[in-house]
């Protein structure tokens, strides 16, 4: 008996899938280059927590283990005073910036910053146990300090970077949950903002939700969320706006090994141990280690050196859409925490007493960002405009382009007195002002709209660019020299000497 094939038949989609076009296909680069610098950027604060008396921040939290996300605001090239106005036609073309190089300058000396907790949940030293562990008491917390994992990171893109961390997930309705049960975990992807904590060696997780005892990790992260860059998600971005390229260096080793105090939620399986008559209870097996970033050296620095962008990893080859650029920096090799003391009395004491001095902690950071930008033009054909509108409609709106709405066949009602109570409530008018999509996010905004210069030989990064590319800088000073003698003058002098 004949039977039809039981294999599944896959029907192709009704319309072809749109293909992502790289920026090099419709962006034309010019031979005009500009240099921009942020000048010196400084930050000072407490490395562990912000000082907020009466819910007002007096001293911010500034740590060497925070992300520094710089939002660089660039000038509009279409309103820029260009040296050559014939490079593009404003009726059919628009200008954009392309980032072709940058140098992240870091000040301050190399140093290792430590963190800790005065009441850390540490029970036993399980690395070198001398005897059988005794049962934990009601409070076994001790004062412990440590250094963190070492990280150097630089992310560059025209959109904010993404980070990932583990948070508390949602429990299913058909699962009974008791107090003290381990919550489900969920991988959360969010935007990395300025001031977010990096992975310090204890995992990328929301410690406020998953460690409510506030004593399993040091002070600076016990109520915070440590994020790790979501490289997989940013690499899968179809347009490649979030990550042009990145620089990364991480290192860590385990320094000390401890275990936690508290009731063990999941006992060690009986198949894994053999008890004895005298030792019939299995000790606590909730182990953890204190991280360490080891040696910091100037030989392994990623900063204070130029990097040039020839080809980005995604489809966006350095084009700064929206006239903005995001630079995310992490540098834990300059995480020194300075201790400052102040005398409580005006007159200096004759003898030392520790109560007569107040101790404070501060961390300082110093940055200097330099960029090289190339001027580019885009010819506004119908295909290019349709593609840009699909990719990001805000680009065309910034260029004062709009799409006409489809014709409406219905008859609309418009009242004469809109604010009258005699008629039904009218819909509020739509907001005409363009909303910043990143208004609710926190970034370190740096205005570069008045920092562009075409005199490349006047800046360190500009001179490095001229040296590597071989482009000749325009000199505004002419060196005076004697005019060479003409051929007629020299021949007449020879004739006079012959007559003599």
Swiss-Prot record:
Subunit organization: Self-assembles into homopentamers. The capsid has an icosahedral symmetry and consists of 72 capsomers, with each capsomer being a pentamer of L1. Interacts with the minor capsid protein L2; this interaction is necessary for viral genome encapsidation. Interacts with protein E2; this interaction enhances E2-dependent replication and transcription activation.
Protein family according to the UniProt entry: Belongs to the papillomaviridae L1 protein family.
Function of the protein: Forms an icosahedral capsid with a T=7 symmetry and a 50 nm diameter. The capsid is composed of 72 pentamers linked to each other by disulfide bonds and associated with L2 proteins. Binds to heparan sulfate proteoglycans on cell surface of basal layer keratinocytes to provide initial virion attachment. This binding mediates a conformational change in the virus capsid that facilitates efficient infection. The virion enters the host cell via endocytosis. During virus trafficking, L1 protein dissociates from the viral DNA and the genomic DNA is released to the host nucleus.
Designated gene of the protein: L1
UniProt xrefs under Pfam families: Late_protein_L1
GO BP annotations listed: endocytosis involved in viral entry into host cell; virion attachment to host cell
Cellular component, GO, one term: host cell nucleus
Localization: Virion; Host nucleus
Region (Disordered): 473-500
Keywords in alphabetical order: Capsid protein, Disulfide bond, Host nucleus, Host-virus interaction, Late protein, T=7 icosahedral capsid protein, Viral attachment to host cell, Viral penetration into host cytoplasm, Virion, Virus endocytosis by host, Virus entry into host cell
Organism of this sequence: Human papillomavirus 44
UniProt GO MF annotations: structural molecule activity
Name by which UniProt lists this protein: Major capsid protein L1
């Amino acid at each position: 008996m004949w039977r039809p094939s039981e294999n599944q038949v896959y029907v192709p989609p009704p319309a072809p899938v749109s293909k992502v076009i790289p920026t090099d296909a419709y962006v034309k680069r010019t031979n005009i280059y500009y240099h921009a610098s942020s000048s010196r950027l400084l930050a000072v604060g407490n490395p562990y927590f912000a000082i907020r008396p009466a819910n007002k921040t007096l001293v911010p939290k500034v740590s060497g283990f925070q992300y520094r996300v710089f939002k660089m605001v660039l000038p509009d090239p279409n309103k820029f005073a260009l040296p050559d106005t014939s490079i593009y036609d404003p009726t059919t073309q628009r200008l954009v910036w392309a980032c072709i190089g940058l140098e992240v300058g870091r000040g301050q000396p190399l140093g290792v910053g430590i963190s800790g907790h005065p009441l850390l949940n540490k029970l036993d030293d399980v690395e070198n146990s001398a005897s059988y562990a005794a049962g934990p008491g009601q409070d076994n917390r001790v004062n412990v300090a440590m250094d963190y994992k070492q990280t150097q990171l630089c992310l560059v893109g025209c959109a904010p970077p993404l980070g990932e961390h583990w948070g508390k997930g949602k429990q299913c309705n058909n699962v009974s949950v008791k107090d003290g049960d381990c919550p489900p975990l969920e991988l959360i992807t969010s935007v990395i903002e300025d001031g977010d904590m990096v992975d310090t060696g204890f995992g990328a997780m929301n410690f406020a939700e998953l460690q409510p005892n506030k004593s399993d990790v040091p002070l600076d992260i016990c109520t915070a969320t440590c994020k790790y860059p979501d490289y997989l998600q940013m690499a899968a971005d179809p347009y490649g706006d979030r990550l042009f390229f990145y620089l990364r260096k991480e290192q860590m080793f385990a320094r000390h090994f401890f275990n936690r105090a508290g009731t063990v939620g999941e006992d060690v399986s009986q198949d894994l141990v053999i008890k004895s008559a005298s030792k019939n209870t299995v000790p606590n097996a909730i182990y953890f280690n204190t991280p360490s970033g080891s040696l910091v050296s100037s030989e392994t620095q990623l900063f204070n050196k130029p990097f040039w962008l020839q080809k980005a990893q995604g489809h966006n080859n350095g084009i700064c859409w929206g006239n903005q650029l995001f630079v995310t920096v992490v540098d834990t090799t300059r995480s020194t925490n300075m201790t400052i003391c102040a005398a409580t009395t005006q007159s200096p004491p004759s003898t030392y007493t520790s109560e007569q001095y107040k101790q404070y902690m501060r961390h300082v950071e110093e940055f200097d960002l330099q960029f090289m930008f190339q001027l580019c033009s885009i010819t506004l054909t119908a295909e290019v405009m349709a593609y840009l509108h699909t990719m990001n409609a805000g680009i065309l709106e910034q260029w004062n382009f709009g799409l006409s709405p489809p014709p409406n066949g219905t008859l609309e009602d418009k009242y004469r007195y809109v604010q009258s109570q005699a008629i039904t409530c009218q819909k509020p008018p739509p907001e005409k002002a363009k909303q910043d999509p990143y208004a609710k996010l926190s970034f370190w905004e740096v205005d570069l709209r008045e920092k562009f210069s075409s005199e490349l030989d006047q800046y360190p990064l500009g001179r490095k660019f001229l040296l590597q590319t071989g482009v000749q800088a325009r000199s505004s000073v002419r060196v005076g020299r004697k005019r060479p003698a003409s051929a007629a003058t020299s021949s007449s002098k020879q004739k006079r000497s012959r007559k003599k």
